[in-house]
Amino acid sequence: MLSHATFWAPPVWLLILLTGIGAAQSRALEHDMLASHNAVRARVGVAPLTWSDRLTARAQDWADTLLARRKFDHRPNSHYGENLFEIAGASASPAQVVEAWAAESRNYDYKSTHCRGVCGHYTQIVWGGTKEVGCAVARGGGLEIWVCNYDPPGNWAGQRPY
């Protein structure tokens, strides 16, 4: 005969197991995102970023909000830099997300500080004054929305990123 405690033990262990899996996935995302950002920064001789749990929580909140609203916009009145990435019907790795932003480097003219097309995601990644990054992803309904926050923010008009 099963005791009451035995009956309830499996759900507790399942919860602990799932929490451990989620934490491991979170650490992997943190590692891969930070490594990818710092690889791009190293290409231009900019000091590496450090990971911020505070910025990550903010990024997760905004990614979840965007997914729930089915909207893709920057957070209004933010005091942080922000990069967004959206993909539908597929999944992206942290390295693919960062490399998509980094590919904008071809649109950036360092001498004039002007972009030919979009380059703000790239310049935020390599902004020399930025010290911390925190990123998150929200998934659902065939969509992935990635958000990275940067502190201090970059992309000041007329200034070179490094």
Residue ranges and their predicted role:
Residues 1-12:
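Bacterial N-terminal signal peptides that target proteins for export
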Residues 2, 26, 155-159:
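Membrane-interface soluble catalytic domains
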